[in-house]
Structures are given as structure tokens and as C-alpha cells.
Amino acid sequence: MTAPLVVLGNPLLDFQADVTAEYLAKYSLKENDAILVDAKSGDAKMAIFDELLQMPETKLVAGGAAQNTARGAAYVLGAGQVVYFGSVGKDKFSERLLNENEKAGVKSMYQVQNDIGTGKCAALITGHNRSLVTDLGAANFFTPDHLDKHWDLVEAAKLFYIGGFHLTVSPDAIVKLGQHAKENSKPFVLNFSAPFIPHVFKDALARVLPYATVIIANESEAEAFCDAFQLDCANTDLEAIAQRIVKDSPVEKTVIFTHGVEPTVVVSSKGTSTYPVKPLDSSKIVDTNGAGDAFAGGFMAGLTKGEDLETSIDMGQWLAALSIQEVGPSYPSEKISYSK
């Protein structure tokens, strides 16, 4: 089964729980941040997963940023329109992810690791904020040859979405898709995903950037990019940062910076536009975890349908607004159709 949209990312099971500021402080964690932990390193933060499993209110939710985006795009496009690549373990966690994707209409092309468990992410919620602690597990072992085995799906795709978290796993796989996209004039969308990506994985990001025709990031990730790449502008000036990325790009590029409830900033060679976020009563906000993934899902659905940039961004904002009224990175069980 081929599909117009191919997504590459790190499939994870989210352990989601409400915690206190003191709990974050206990592990030196920050609100609205994302970090990686390694089970083999003896990192004290690995204890978080066991602690969350002991909490009766902890919810297990299918996650992984790009996988959330894939399900979001499928929510809009319908079944059979999205293929998702990533690596999982042979365990009950991956079965759960597979079932969630099937229900959402996403075709899962998992590379299965027999001896390594499926990755997991602790989503620690404080009010309307979240802090993510990720043990990549099997997600860390994706290899480009898995794409080769399913290259017919790549060739049939019309556009690609790459989760920036995958830069920590296989930049080679991203480049392989990027080269195909470039040679065949297909849109190639890259999400920065987290502030640590430009800082810690700067070389991998620099290697992949030339292939991206669209960049998506939030204000924290834009600031991190500005600092890591030493741009000569204020790290809070989203428009200036985006303009530098567009100016320095060897390909025509559109940069989209989301900023919570502040207007979305969009810069291309044609100029700068801002798109106000429609206000949502705070009493309706249930959970902001995955809001950025939902924005990307709605946006990618718009591109896949052939909508213009303005409509695609509106679809992203619309889907993000739906998602934050649900628990976890998910969407209403009853299908709601987009309308301007």
C-alpha cells in the first residue's frame, strides 16, 4: 500500500502524568523542555519510568513526536494516506503503538528489534506545561537499509515529514530521503523538535538542512538554533532568525515558527507573514502535550491535499486547538472536519 505522505521518526510509548514543580526539581528538569536518557548510563532519571508506573493516574499513550504528527495528518486525510517509518522492540508496547496507528489510519512500517525494548517517553505535566524525558530504546536502532527494503513506498510518496528527534538516530536515513526528495522536486519538511537538537546535534542538523524545503520549529527551538549557529541577530527575534535561515539556504525554503498563543511567523523568499492563533478559552484546555505535533499534522495534511500555505497553516492551528482539548497527543474520537 502506497501513500502520498511518508513520515520518519522515533516511535515511543508516552508515560504521561501530572507532577509537581518539586518533582521536576528533584531531577533538575525544566518545564517545556525535552531531554534524552540512556538505560545503560545509570542515569538517575531512568527511575522516573518506574515511579510513573506506580502512580495510578499515569496514562500510557502512543507517542513519539513524528508519529503523533502522522496520526494527526491521517485524522484529516483519512485512512491509507500516511506511511510511518521508525524502529520498535518486539514487545507489548510496540503492539500498542501498532494498534493505535491502525485505528488512526496510519500504515506502520516498523523496523523490529528482537533484543531491545520499544522506546518510551515520560511526559511530565505541570499545569499547561510539559517536560519530556525520553529513553529511545529500539527507536535508536533504525537503519537506512529499512528504507531500501520499502523503497517503493518512498518512490510513490509525494512529500516527506521528518521529526528532528531522528537526527539523534540516523542522519543517513534522513539524507537518503532528502536526496530522493531533491532529485524528484518533492516537498521535504523538517521539524527541529527540541532545543537540544541544534545544540547537541548541530552537525547532523547542518547536514540535513540543505534538503529541507520547509522548516517547522517553536520559539525555544528557534532561539537554540540562533545560539548554536551563532546568527548575528537577537535570539528572540523570530522573524530575523527565519530570514537568516531562508537567506543561507541553497534551496527555496519556507520557515514556520510557532509561538504558543502568539502569532505564527512564516518567512520565505517572498517575505514575512504572521498568522494569529484563534483564542481558545483556557477552561477548554485539557493538555498541551503534543500541540506542536498536532500543528505539524494539520499543516502536512494541508500540503498533502494541495492547499496553499495560508490554508495549511490554518489547518495546523485548527488541529492543535482540537488536540489540546484531549488527553495526551491525541485527537477527538468523533471525527471533526476542517472548515475555514
From Swiss-Prot:
Active site per UniProt: 293
Xref: InterPro entries: Adenokinase, Carboh/pur_kinase_PfkB_CS, PfkB_dom, Ribokinase-like
Keyword hit for Translocase: no
Reaction equation(s) it catalyzes: adenosine + ATP = AMP + ADP + H(+)
GO biological process terms on file: AMP salvage; purine nucleobase metabolic process; purine ribonucleoside salvage
Pfam families: PfkB (PF00294)
Role: ATP dependent phosphorylation of adenosine and other related nucleoside analogs to monophosphate derivatives. ADO1 does not play a major role in adenine utilization in yeast. Its physiological role could primarily be to recycle adenosine produced by the methyl cycle.
Family affiliation: Belongs to the carbohydrate kinase PfkB family.
Note: Present with 22200 molecules/cell in log phase SD medium.
Name this polypeptide is given: Adenosine kinase
Protein species of origin: Saccharomyces cerevisiae (strain ATCC 204508 / S288c) (Baker's yeast)
